[in-house]
Amino acid sequence: MGICSSTCCGGRARDGLYEPVLADSEREAVADLLQYLENRGETDFFSGEPLRALSTLVFSENIDLQRSASLTFAEITERDVREVDRDTLEPILFLLQSPDIEVQRAASAALGNLAVDTENKVLIVQLGGLTPLIRQMMSPNVEVQCNAVGCITNLATHEENKAKIARSGALGPLTRLAKSRDMRVQRNATGALLNMTHSDENRQQLVNAGAIPVLVQLLSSPDVDVQYYCTTALSNIAVDASNRRKLAQSEPKLVQSLVNLMDSTSPKVQCQAALALRNLASDEKYQLDIVRANGLHPLLRLLQSSYLPLILSAVACIRNISIHPMNESPIIETNFLKPLVDLLGSTDNEEIQCHAISTLRNLAASSDRNKALVLDAGAVQKCKQLVLDVPITVQSEMTAAIAVLALSDDLKSHLLNLGVCGVLIPLTHSPSIEVQGNSAAALGNLSSKVGDYSIFVQNWTEPQGGIHGYLCRFLQSGDATFQHIAVWTLLQLFESEDKTLIGLIGKAEDIIEHIRSIANRQIEPDNEFEDEDEGEVVNLAQRCLELLGQSMSKAHIEG
């Protein structure tokens, strides 16, 4: 609408035919506009006569009138932001293309204000708003740069716009402006770059535009907002394995910068620094680098804070770091065990509980010494106290941790005496396959070479069907893994040479029947790997029957 009028006005003005008419309409529009501005609180500038008066000034060839129009748009959008239509946006977009700095500055401010509204964000891009905004980002005027970047930052918060912005050529100028000496421009540019990091494709475009070194360099900015935007953007970029490889090759100072930011005075920066390190620590190299950069002490401080997001980001990070076997002892020596155990009971936040118990399991994974230290820190007592009442995801992690600790021959008696069977047996009834399997695996580990089997005798039928009920259900489940766990556990119980326990098994006709059924199973040669697994279960079942026969014969002879 507006551009067409402008062309017509420009064309007729040369021969003077309509010049007085245009001048009159402009004078009339100025007078009307002044009257509307007198009553601005009651005037809707986005429709009807007020918008027509503004549009007349916009499409005038008089630069002063264009300046007045752009300043009016900037002023009214400062206090009245709402959804508008193309009749409002097109005049502002026309003003963006003016060569005049004042017009550009005010028009981009107005557009940035309107770009706060969700519907306007989409329409501005649909009407071609990105091209003039990109041009303004390259303006030598800092105010124009600042407003244009601020507008793109707002536009980039809408999912529908992000890919369009990434493909528009805006990322190069945004990356350059992130290094601006003007803090407002820098802040807006890094905010826009952050908004572009929420999808794989856009992150890739950002990396290709050379944003990574700029974001890393700006981690040392004195401005907290810039630190936050850059840390969060790098955290999102580090989600992708290919980007982590690029970061590892080109940014040797990244880990140390993020470790330093965990000591920031701003909790939101601390939080994002820990989350960025957590994403980096998906890779082995970074798991080691964070420990070498003295990242454990600041993580421990965050883990012990009273602010939930800080605790969550720190415990998520330490979980990933603890995956590397070489980090187990350094983490334990930094005194993480007790705080991690305390986290299990001090919050009902499921994520925090999962990360905490998973970290404890990782720390116990590769040495009996570390398993003993985890046990001494009270991890098992805390799990026993909580496990029947926590969400299934936490139950799964807790039972997996107990199963790992139960691998240590030195700790089995201690674990049994703590009463873990009293919670593991009921959890074999869980609706979760994982919880069932972990609980049964823990019972199986505890049944091997334990010395004193009296607790298995005590728990033969209780609680909830006891060891007897659990073995029966797993043997008849039809699940190869469950059957394997149950048959292997039975074999350990037979090998215990505990007469009372073996006598109880011998009298359990249902168990013996299931064992015979498995022992007599014919293996179909369909799948080589399945055959091996099934063959092992059959062999274990046959060995159980053999030991049962020997013990029964021995009992007859002794009798």
Swiss-Prot record:
GO BP annotations, alphabetical order? autophagosome assembly; nucleus-vacuole junction assembly
Pfam (any one)? Arm
Organism domain of life: Eukaryota
- Start and end residues of the ARM repeats are 77-116, 118-157, 159-198, 200-239, 243-282, 284-323, 325-365, 409-448
Q: Does the keyword Coiled coil apply?
A: no
Lipid moiety (N-myristoyl glycine) attached at 2
Bilayer topology annotation: Lipid-anchor
Please give the Gene Ontology molecular function terms for this protein: protein-membrane adaptor activity
This protein's record includes keyword Membrane: yes
Q: Which Gene3D superfamilies does the UniProt entry name for this protein?
A: Leucine-rich Repeat Variant
Q: Where are the transmembrane segments?
A: none
Q: Where is the lipid attached (S-palmitoyl cysteine)?
A: 4
Q: Where in the cell is it found?
A: Vacuole membrane
Q: Which PANTHER family match?
A: VACUOLAR PROTEIN 8
Q: Describe the family membership recorded for this protein in Swiss-Prot or TrEMBL.
A: Belongs to the beta-catenin family.
Protein name per the record: Vacuolar protein 8
User: Which gene specifies this protein's sequence?
Assistant: VAC8
